[in-house]
UniProtKB/Swiss-Prot annotation:
Residues 711-928 are annotated as: Sufficient for interaction with UPF3A and UPF3B. The keyword Cell membrane does not apply. The gene is UPF2. Residues 839-859 are annotated as: Binds to UPF3B. Its main location: cytoplasm. Keywords: Coiled coil, Cytoplasm, Nonsense-mediated mRNA decay, Phosphoprotein, Repeat, RNA-binding. Gene3D superfamilies: 1.25.40.180, 4.10.80.160, 6.10.250.770. InterPro entries: ARM-type_fold, MIF4G-like_typ-3, Nmd2/UPF2, Upf2/Nmd2_C. This is Regulator of nonsense transcripts 2. GO terms for molecular function: RNA binding; telomeric DNA binding. Changing residue 1120 to E: Decreases interaction with UPF1; does not reduce NMD efficiency. It holds the Pfam family MIF4G. Changing residue 1174 to E: Greatly reduces NMD efficiency. Ubiquitous.
């Protein structure tokens, strides 16, 4: 314990110390010169002089090394912290991404439900409307039919016509109007008809009605007028029927009948028959004859299918008794009743049904035939695309026409099938065979969403897919009024985009032609190597110049103080700082919210176009900005693509060998926009084709840059795969034929294999039973620090009675390298909990781990290094969780330094000279469990092992394989120093192989002496070190203060310093620590007796036989310990006082000054601080005074602590005195005030006690805390 430090000597005393020291040295030299020879004097003087610099140099080196170690340790800690922070950030981002995905899925599901509900509601409304219209039409027809059938009985008499207008002018005008009947003229025509006498104009009126060019919507008005004619004039219906028959007979001679007129006429006569103007016999026969003529003439081409569909839709329910499938489903789904067909009997409807079904059968045959032809055309076009990369214009145009007619035929077939309540025929789709699209990926069956990590995916990983596909929807955040001007243009562009997409899809599937024509076309079709030009190149250049010129004009016209202009300029200046997805999305939203004007959009396009050529990292984010803004402002993408297209065309035309960075920037920007689908794939492939047409110099770099940017996207997209593959093969052929430079060859190969990597062998996943897969999932995936208890519960539920399951679990635990390195301790924890229920599992796992470690040393192959590291780590964790004894750990450690190592130091095949992996294994085990070898016998065992370990390390360092050119790895030195500094911070490391060997020899000699195998005479040289060893062992019993004496005083804050505070507790702790290896009782017998220095060796102990008395005793002991713990839990814990009082006789000795006449002693006492060391041997306490130099950290810290305590005492003293003085002044002022208010003399201090005046001026506690007399 440190005593009170003496005051330092004055400056005069310090100055006089060197002189006194020199005098004493000279006197000693004169006296000794008489007794010793001169040579001895010189040698001793040299030793004394040279010893001090060496010690100082060693201290400086040690301080420097420790400082470096601390700095390195600090850097490592900072690195670990940075890694942890990055991991946390990644986990947070992952969680955030998962949360966003979950929200998107929920929103999508909600939106889907809403859409389904809206669709169902819309369907219901349509069904109800259809139901209402059907009933209204049914009632109108029925009412009108009854009127027309009863017309002969209700026609007016002759005198009625005399009152009507019979003038020629009005009647001829009315007849002319009948040639242009429309629904809007119904009321006016009905009014004119009621006021005219048309009995002499019936023939003209009939001719006008038959010749009228009606629309489908005007038929009802014409039927209404015919009903009026029929109800008033008896000869109208026969005349009309005769005219219709003549009209249809004349139409038979027409080669190209008018389909619109035919459709209208057929419905017209059907409506006239339904409403009763024509009799059923006359009308139905006319309708059947005309319908049969149409169908017979159209059985092959089916050009009149629209006429039949119109007839079935408007009149099929009454004429043919048709009930459409849509009506049936609506009636069943919404419980609606549609009107029955009561106008015409079912017997008369049957011929019409048969005729229509025959027509539908022929239509389906036609559809199947066209479908087969279309499939053949698709296969032929794929062959052409695969071989040549593109289709000819004639074939392209021919297929477009054929595909359009097929789609029209398919739609008509579906409509007619619904009206006739028939099923559509099966139209199977062709599955493309591998030879159609050649070797490589299957681009026609792309992976499902979430399978982009598989071979054949468009994107390299999930992050790339999210970056290029998951864009924010500005329309969901920005008010619609901010992009209202662009809505129409956006819709037009989207429709054009859809048309273009259909054209592209049709480009893959084309046309009808014979095999001979196809072969001829394949031979004639070649890729033209002439210089190609992009369409609209001149317009693109003009747009570039126009936009760049407008910048100067706007800058001149814009007012310098414009607030919006300042905002836009600031936005464009900050745009290069948007280097991640969140920032660029925020910038897009900001621009759309605050700066969406035509002029600002042009400024943005210019800023994006003139991005610096060195900032290629900005191009993906700028392309994302353009793609994000595209739904709201499509002109940004269009203008930018046009400018890039013109710039590309300019560079290709110029053919200079400068500005390669600008060229690469342009093509890379085009590639990024292509991946966002802003730049069309056709244009991108056309750019690549232009570069391949003149494949030299900069064009090679531009082509490779373009392919490295978007080649994978183009090659793996179905619509561009074939053309891209053809262009890639052409590029490789040109590489072979053109004898390019080695740099260009490498670039071309890299670009090609980036787009189309060679097929890799797929790893076949081993199939295991479900229970084994579940065990592997628990141990290798689910197990973590948080889920250990949960996994243990699940593991306990396994069928342990099944030996196969038990063996598999043991095997999985032994194969610890399959577990994440940071989760190995969780497996040890799990095993420790599992052993309580399955005892033999722990034994088998430990045996397996030890066997694997031994096997690793025997095989010694580098591919097992990570596996061996995991096994060593697992063994250390098993000791931490008390699954193995310390003897197993030390046996393994010694095997690392001795197995396969030749005693004579010669190289061994099991441990080659350059092989340092065993050192790493030792450090791994010591880093894992070495911290628990800090006291008792395990501490001494570790100290002994470290001696042997240093010898092994120095033996490795001394081998000839390590030279100046190939030095010993510094990371191994750092790893060893880190491990030893953690375990024994005060250990003195060896500096050479000889020193390490000498330490091993000394250590072995000491133990041989203790064992009595060597006489003391043979080891006189080692007596002093043997005494030191005994002192170390004695001091281990009483405490760890010797660590302070033997090591560096700077490490005074170690936990060992606390052990000397209480001797009894220390003994108990040491006994408890010695018995930590509790798995077997024999370990206690093997430990060294702490009371005696002799070593006792015992053989195998007696086996413990369990009995009932032992179990009763253990139960009673557990009960007593539990009661004791419950009693002690209520007691207050007494904190141990670290400072032990110094005996009085030592205090008086310490207060005495240094011996007189000793200048050197005074100097030493001035530079040192006296401490008292308390030791104990047996029951006897021993005190020893230590003079610790002031340069040590221990003395400096204690001196600073004393000064701080002294300052705190002085501060409290001053504070207390100030409080007392202030209280006295307040009392005095109060007394004067009370005397002034009461002139009459009175005893005011009658109840107040007299003030106690402390002799030293201490504060009055009663006065301060007001516990004295009462105040008034």
């Amino acid at each position: 314990m440190p005593a009170e430090r003496k005051k330092p000597a004055s400056m005069e005393e310090k100055d006089s110390l060197p002189n006194n020291k020199e005098k004493d040295c000279s006197e000693r030299r004169t006296v000794s010169s008489k007794e010793r020879p001169k040579d001895d004097i010189k040698l001793t003087a040299k030793k004394e002089v040279s010893k001090a610099p060496e010690d100082k140099k060693k201290r400086l080196e040690d301080d420097k090394r420790k400082k470096e170690d601390k700095e390195r340790k600090k850097k490592d800690e900072e690195k670990v912290k940075a890694e942890e922070e990055s991991k946390k950030k990644e986990e947070e981002e992952k969680k955030k991404h998962q949360e966003e995905e979950r929200k998107k899925q929920e929103e999508q599901a909600k939106r889907q439900q809403e859409e389904e509900a809206a669709a169902q509601m819309k369907e219901k409304e349509e069904s109800i409307q259809l139901h209402q219209e059907a009933w209204e039409r049914h009632h109108l027809r029925k009412e009108l039919r009854s009127k027309n059938q009863n017309a002969p009985d209700s026609r007016p008499e002759e005198n009625f016509f005399s009152r009507l207008d019979s003038s020629l002018k009005k009647n001829t005008a009315f007849v002319k109007k009948l040639k242009t009947i429309t629904e809007q003229q119904r009321d006016s025509l009905s009014h004119d008809f009621n006021g005219l006498n048309l009995s002499k104009y019936i023939a003209e009126a009939v001719a006008s009605i038959v010749e009228a060019k009606l629309k489908i919507s005007d038929v009802n008005c014409a039927v209404h007028l015919c009903s009026l004619f029929h109800q008033r004039y008896a000869d109208f219906a026969p005349s009309l029927l005769q005219v219709w028959k003549k009209h249809f007979e004349a139409r038979k001679e027409e080669k190209t009948p008018n389909i619109t007129k035919l459709r209208t006429d057929l419905r017209f006569i059907a409506e006239l028959t339904i409403v009763g103007i024509f009799t059923d016999k006359e009308g139905l026969s006319l309708i059947y004859e005309q319908l049969k003529n149409i169908i017979n003439a159209d059985r092959e081409s089916h050009t009149h299918v629209s006429v039949v569909i119109s007839f079935c839709r408007h009149c099929g329910d009454d004429i043919a008794g048709l009930v459409p499938r849509k009506v049936k489903s609506a009636a069943e789904k919404f419980n609606l009743s549609f009107p029955p067909s009561e106008i015409i009997s079912p017997e008369k409807q049957q011929p019409f049904q048969n005729l229509l079904k025959e027509y539908f059968t022929s239509l389906t045959k036609h559809l199947k035939r066209d479908h087969r032809e279309l499939q053949n055309t698709e296969r032929q076009n794929r062959r052409i695309l695969h071989s040549k990369g593109e289709l000819s214009e004639d074939r392209h145009k021919q297929y477009e026409e054929f595909a359009m007619s097929y789609q029209k035929l398919l739609a008509n077939s579906q409509s007619l099938a619904d009206l006739l309540d028939e099923n559509m025929p099966d139209l199977p789709q062709d599955k493309p065979t591998p030879e159609e699209h050649g070797p490589g990926i299957d681009i026609f069956t792309p992976g499902k969403p979430g399978e982009y990590d598989l071979e054949g995916g468009i994107w390299e990983d999930e992050d790339a897919r999210n970056f290029y596909e998951n864009l924010i929807d500005l329309k969901a955040f920005v008010p619609a009024i901010l992009f209202k001007d662009n809505e129409k243009s956006c819709q037009n562009k989207e429709s054009n985009k859809d048309d273009t997409k259909e054209a592209k899809e049709s480009k893959e599937n084309k046309e009808v032609s014979s095999p001979d024509d196809l072969e001829l076309e394949l031979e004639n079709l070649e890729i033209n190597d002439d210089t190609l030009e992009l369409e609209g190149g001149d317009e693109a250049e003009d747009l570039t110049k126009k936009l760049l010129d407008e910048q100067e004009q706007e800058d001149e016209e814009a007012s310098t103080g414009s607030h919006l202009k300042l905002i836009v300029d600031a936005f464009l200046q900050q745009l290069p700082n948007c280097v991640n997805r969140d920032l660029i999305d925020k910038a897009a939203m900001d621009f759309c919210m605050n700066m969406n004007t035509k002029a600002n959009r042009k400024k943005l396009v210019r800023a994006l176009f003139i991005v610096p050529r060195q900032r290629l990292d900005l191009l993906p984010f700028y392309a994302r900005l353009v793609a994000t803004l595209h739904p709201c402002m499509s002109d940004v993408a269009e203008d930018l693509c046009s400018m890039l297209r013109g710039d590309f065309r300019f560079h290709v035309r110029k053919k200079d060998q400068i500005n390669i960075e600008t060229k690469n920037k342009t093509v890379r920007f085009i590639g990024e926009l292509t991946k966002f689908k802003m730049f069309t794939k056709n244009d991108t492939l056309h750019c690549l084709k232009m570069l391949l047409s003149d494949f030299s110099h900069h064009h090679i770099e531009m082509a490779c840059t373009l392919l490295e940017t978007c080649g994978r996207f183009l090659f793996r997209s179905p619509e561009s795969h074939l053309r891209t593959s053809v262009l890639l093969e052409q590029m490789m052929r040109k590489k072979q034929a053109m004898h390019l430079d080695a740099r260009y060859v490498t670039m071309v190969e890299n670009a090609y294999y980036y787009c189309n990597p060679p097929p890799a062998e797929k790893t076949v996943k081993k199939k295991r039973p479900p229970l084994q897969e579940y065990v592997r999932k628990l141990l290798y995936k689910d197990l973590s620090k948080v889920t250990t208890e949960k996994v243990l519960r699940q593991m306990r539920k396994l069928p342990w009675q099944d030996q196969e399951v038990k063996d598999y679990v043991i095997c999985c635990m032994i194969n610890i390298w399959n577990v994440k390195y940071n989760s190995i301790h969780c497996v040890a924890n799990l095993l420790a909990g599992l052993v309580l229920y399955q005892e033999d599992v722990g034994i088998h796992v430990v045996d397996g781990v030890l066997e694997d470690i031994r096997l690793g040393m025997e095989v010694n192959q580098p591919k097992f290094n990570q596996r061996r590291i995991s096994s060593a780590k697992f063994l250390g964790e098993l000791y931490n969780y008390r699954m193995v004894e310390s003897a197993v750990i030390f046996r393994t450690l010694y095997s690392f330094t001795s197995f396969g190592v030749n005693p004579d130091g010669s190289p061994s095949s099991l441990d080659p000279p350059e092989h340092l992996f065993r050192i790493r294994l030792v450090c791994t085990i010591l880093d894992t469990c070495g911290q628990y070898f800090d006291r008792g016998s395990s501490k001494r065992k570790l100290d002994c092992f470290l001696v042997y370990f240093q010898r092994y390390v120095w033996w490795k360092k001394s081998l000839e394989v390590w030279t100046k050119d190939h030095p010993f790895p510094i990371d191994i030195d750092y790893m060893i120093s880190d491990t030893l500094e953690l375990l024994r911070p005060k250990i003195k490391l060896c500096n050479s192989l000889e020193e390490s060997i000498r330490q091993v020899q000394d250590l072995e000699r000491e133990f041989l002496i203790k064992l009595g195998l060597v006489n003391d005479k043979d080891s006189k040289d080692s007596m002093t070190e043997g005494e030191n060893l005994e002192e170390d062992e004695e001091e281990e019993e009483g405490g760890a203060e010797t660590e302070e004496q033997s090591g560096n005083e700077s490490e005074v804050n170690e936990p060992e310093e606390e052990e000397g505070s209480d001797n009894d507790d220390d003994e108990g702790e040491e006994e408890e620590e010695e018995n930590t290896d509790y798995l077997t009782d024999s370990n206690k017998e093997n430990e060294t007796d702490e009371e005696n220095t002799e070593v006792m060796i015992k053989g195998g102990g007696l086996k413990h036989v369990p009995c009932v008395e032992d179990e009763d005793f253990i139960q009673a002991l557990d009960k007593m310990m539990l009661e004791n713990l419950q009693q002690r839990s209520g007691e207050s814990v007494k904190v141990h006082q670290l400072d032990v009082a110094i005996p009085l006789h030592l205090k008086s000795q310490l207060r005495k000054g240094p011996p007189l006449g000793g200048g050197e002693g005074e100097a030493e006492s001035a530079d040192t601080m006296p401490f008292v060391m308390l030791t104990r041997k047996g029951n006897k306490q021993q005190f020893k005074i230590l003079n610790v130099p002031m340069s040590s950290q221990l003395a400096a810290n204690h001196w600073n602590q004393q000064q701080a305590e002294q300052e705190e005492r002085m501060r409290m003293k001053k504070l207390t005195l100030d409080i007392n003085e202030r209280q006295e002044q307040e009392d005095y002022q109060e007394m004067l005030q009370s005397l002034a208010q009461r002139p009459a003399p009175a005893n005011t201090n009658r109840e107040r006690r007299p003030r106690y005046q402390h002799p030293k001026g201490a504060p009055n506690a009663d006065l301060i805390f007001k516990t004295g007399g009462r105040r008034r």
